[in-house]
Design a protein with these regions (language model features):
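PLP-dependent aminotransferase class I/II
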Residues: 6-14, 26, 38, 55-60, ...
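A glycine-/small-polar-enriched, mobile loop at the entrance of the PLP active site in fold-type I
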Residues: 23-28, 37-57
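Helix C-cap/helix->beta junction micro-motif
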Residues: 113, 166-167, 317
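Active-site phosphate-binding strand-loop segment of PLP-dependent enzymes
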Residues: 125-206, 212-214, 355
Length: 377
């Protein structure tokens, strides 16, 4: 009976205000629906569904947006990362520097290439890889540095590129969460090889899985195009051990529709982030702000020592949140026997982080309500 009364109280609290979803793709995409339907009809009637004009158009548009010479559309963000490594044909067992605080896909891409991930702890202010810790992890087996612009905030690319150039190591940028982010005015995905995801929840999201690679290296671009299509540059001629990782015409066409609004989406999210940063009280650790970082706030995360209690409290008041991410990569079951070492900074982040609603479908009023509830915790 006590449990029923408690449940009724929660329902009463929620019913007083509409639920604020962490993100609703229906709300995020509703303004694009008419254009999406027309675009889908156009692709359907074209009779060409793989690597056609729609893919070429989006590749050109996204390359121009990023500021790279080439964009190569692929099937997913994970595939983009894998191909960004595969193109170098590193010997099996070679080491790749990678942040310990990231989504598992970053590390999976290394393992799928028969390479060894060497984890580097993040900076606790930015949550991105700490450049001052990279050099001590470089050995004679190190072949590349893979960095992640996590949550939409770019890494410190000055320090990373200086180390990479000194050791003659290629840099692969995981830009899955950072479309349009800039470091000192330069877009991510142009410092090294950029790997992008267009998963539906991303700032530039497709209506399914999709990804892309950006580069200004003509030779790499040619090989990327071959690797994504069975290692073929000419029909029925295969020069490499390739893959089937092609961006399809439907997703490319939908992405072209949404790309036109990406700057608007980014500015909306930055406006919502500014409200959080201005109005949240000091009990919550908010994302660091600096003039050198143009943060696109794919995710707005706060940190709090009572994260789980806070998450439950917000849900009680009709506000849904997420955790990015509840389990760090080195503690995942799949990584047993693969990754060793202790990563206390990553664990601190994973144990205290909470992602708040901040999408194109949220209003300023939504954010003010979240803040009002948070500040009463």
């Amino acid at each position: 009976m006590v449990h029923k009364v408690h449940a009724l109280k929660i329902l009463k609290n929620i019913s007083m205000n509409p639920i604020i979803e962490y993100e609703s793709l229906l709300n995020t995409n509703k303004q694009f629906n008419d254009a999406y339907l027309q675009t889908f009809q156009s692709v359907l009637e074209s009779g060409w569904y793989i690597l056609g004009d729609k893919v070429k158009r989006f590749e050109n548009e996204f390359a121009n947006f990023v500021g790279s010479t080439h964009c190569i559309g692929v099937a997913s963000g994970l595939d983009a990362l894998m191909l960004a490594l595969k193109v170098y044909d590193f010997p099996a067992g070679s080491e790749v520097i990678v942040p310990s605080n990231t989504y598992i896909a970053t590390i999976l891409s290394i393992l799928h290439c028969n390479l060894k991930p060497v984890l580097v702890e993040p900076d606790l202010d930015t949550y991105n890889i700490n450049p001052t810790l990279i050099e001590e992890k470089i050995t004679s087996k190190t072949k590349a540095i893979m960095i992640v612009h996590l949550y939409g905030k770019p890494c410190n690319m000055d320090e990373i590129m200086e180390i990479a150039e000194r050791y003659n190591l290629p840099v692969i940028e995981d830009c899955a969460q950072a479309h349009g982010a800039k470091f000192k005015g330069k877009q991510v995905g142009t410092f090294g090889t950029g790997a992008f995801s267009f998963y539906p929840t991303k700032n530039l999201g497709a209506i399914g899985d999709a990804g892309a690679i950006t580069t200004s290296n003509d030779d790499l671009a040619r090989k990327f195009r071959s690797l994504r299509n069975y290692g073929s540059e000419a029909k029925y001629q295969n020069d490499y051990i390739g893959y089937n990782s092609r961006l399809d015409e439907v997703q490319a066409a939908m992405l072209s529709v949404k790309l036109k609004f990406l700057n608007e989406i980014t500015e909306h999210k930055r406006k919502l982030a500014a409200i959080y940063l201005s109005e949240l009280n000091e009990d919550f650790i908010c994302p660091a702000v600096s003039d050198v970082y143009f943060d696109v706030y794919h995710i707005f995360n706060i940190r709090h020592p009572k994260r789980d209690e806070l998450k439950a409290y917000l849900l009680k008041h009709g506000i849904k949140t997420e955790i990015h991410y509840p389990i760090p990569p080195h503690k995942q079951k799949a990584m047993l026997g693969i990754i060793s070492g202790i990563y206390p900074i990553s664990e601190e982040i994973h144990n205290t982080t909470l992602s708040l609603p901040i999408s194109y479908g949220h209003s300023e009023e939504d954010i003010l309500r979240v803040i009002e509830v948070l500040n009463k915790f």
